[in-house]
Amino acid sequence: MAEKAEAVGAVRAVGNWVNGEVVESTSDRYGDVFDSATGERCAQVVMSTEGDVDAAIAAAKAALPAWSRTPVLRRARVMFKLKELIERDRAEIAQLITQEHGKVLHDADGEIQRGLEVVEFACGIPHLIKGEFNDQVGTGVDSYSMRQPVGVCAGITPFNFPAMVPMWMFPLAIACGNTFILKPSEKDPSCSLKWAELLAEAGLPPGVFNVVQGDHVAVNTILNDERIGAVSFVGSTPVAEHVYSTASANGKRVQALGGAKNHLVVMPDADMDKAADALVGAGYGSAGERCMAISAVVTVGDSAEPLLEKLLPKIEALKVGTGMDNSNEMGPLITAEHRDKVRSYIDLGEEEGAKLVVDGRQHEITKSPGYFLGPTLFDHASQDMRVYQEEIFGPVLTMIRVDTFDDAIRVINEHEYGNGTSIFTRDGDAAREFANHIEVGMVGVNVPIPVPLAFHSFGGWKRSLFGDMSIYGMEGVRFYTRLKTVTSRWPTGIRSGADFSMPTM
C-alpha cells in the first residue's frame, strides 16, 4: 500500500466524490492503479476511511428528502441528459477503461453501449413506477398502490466492467428517487469519477450521487451502516455471501451477484463454424474476465472432434495485444497477481490430468510487458477437476465430453453455479427442452453470451445470486422501490356513523 505523499506528483490521484465535488480524504493509504498492457503505474487511488464513507452517507441522506420528492419527469430528464453526455464522451470513457482494465477499445465501447441501454430504460421511469388503482372496492372506498424510493442505496462493483456494472445500478436507483453511493473496484476506479462529473453536468443535485474509493474498510462500513437501505453487489461468490449475510443482518435489501461457470453445449447437429466462433469470442473476449464468459464446453456425442477441427485454427489466429490497438481481439489481464492466479490454474489442470491442447503460458505475447496470457484450451476434463469446478476468470476453456443430451443437462445442473449457459443446435425440440429444464438463470440458444437487454433482468441461480431480485429491468425497479398500498374513503362514504369492521361491499 502506497504512502499518501506518493499520490501527489508523477501519477494521477483518484479520490472521492461527495456532495457534488471531489473531496480530500482523511486516509493515509493509497493503492496503485496499473496500465495492464505495460505494467506501469498510471494512477493512485485513495483507500477511504470509515469517516470518508460516513461523510458520503451523510450527504446522501441529506439529499434524499428533496430528491425523492422531485417530480418523476424531472428525474427522467436528468437521465436523458446523462445519455447525451455519455455519448458525447464515449471515446474518452473507452480509453479510461482500456488503460486500467486492459480490454480492447471496441470491447470497452461495447461495455459502454450495454450500460447506456440501462440509462435509456431509466429514461422511461414515469411509466415504470406507475401503481395500480381500483375504484369502489367497497362502498365509497378506493384502493391504489404506489412505488416509493427505498432511501440511500449503495453499489459495490467489480473490476471487469468499470463502466457497465455501475450503470446496471445507479441510473435506475436515482431515477426511482433514491440517493446513491458507488464503491467501485480499486483496480480500475477512474470511470466512477467520470460518472459523477457527467451526472453533475446533467443537472443532478449535490449529494444524490457519491463515490467512495477503497477496499474492505469502505465495503464493511457500507454494509453495517443503518442509514443505507439497499445494497447492490457484483463480484465473486465468497464476497457476495459476505455482502448478503452482513447487509441483510443489518436490515438492508440486498442483491448480491456472485461467481459463474458458464457452459456452452455443442450438439452433433450444430453449425460447427458458428459454435467455434462463439467459443472464441465468449471464452477469450476481455481475456475471459466476464461473469458471463463461456469457460466450460460440453460436447455431446461425436461433436468434439468436428468442433476442435474448426476451433483450433480460430484460437491460433486470435490477435492478442495491447487494448489501445483496435485490431487486437484480446488484451491483458487486470493485474500481475490475477495473471499469475490464472497461470496457476493452467498448471493445476495439467496436474489433474486434463489434456492441454492450447497452452497460453507459451504464447509469444507473454514475453511483452504487461499482464498477458494467451488463450488456453483443455480437453477431456472431468467434473471432479478443480479446473472445471472453479471460476478461473481468465482465457481458459475447459472441454468435457458427454454421451447424450441428458448427460449435458445433468452435468450443468450438478454444478454449484447457475449464472449463464448456452446450447448450439439446429434441433428446436432440444433447444426448447434445454431452456425449460436447465437450472440456470440466463439461457442462450445459438447465442453464446445471453446477457439480457436492459428491459429484461440479469441474474443467475444457485450460488450465482444471493437475494430475491435480479439486477436492472423491472426487477431493478422493484429492488429500488418499496410498494405502498393506500385504501381511502372520503366523508360521503362514512355518513352512516361508526364502522367496526373492515370496509368491504
Regions found by a protein language model. Give the residues of each.
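ALDH superfamily catalytic-core signature
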Residues: 238-382, 411, 445, 492-496, ...
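Hydrophobic face of amphipathic alpha-helices that form TPR/SEL1-like repeat modules
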Residues: 1-37
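Rossmann-like NAD(P) dinucleotide-binding subdomain of oxidoreductase/dehydrogenase enzymes
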Residues: 131-274, 327, 402, 467
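Residue-level signal for inorganic ion chemistry
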Residues: 39, 75, 97, 119, ...
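Structural signal for hydrophobic packing residues in well-ordered secondary-structure cores
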Residues: 64, 68, 83-86, 90, ...
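Glycine-rich loop-to-alpha-helix module at the N-terminal edge of alpha/beta enzyme cores
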Residues: 40-129, 140
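Short, solvent-exposed loop/turn elements at beta->coil junctions and helix N-caps
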Residues: 81, 140-142, 360-366
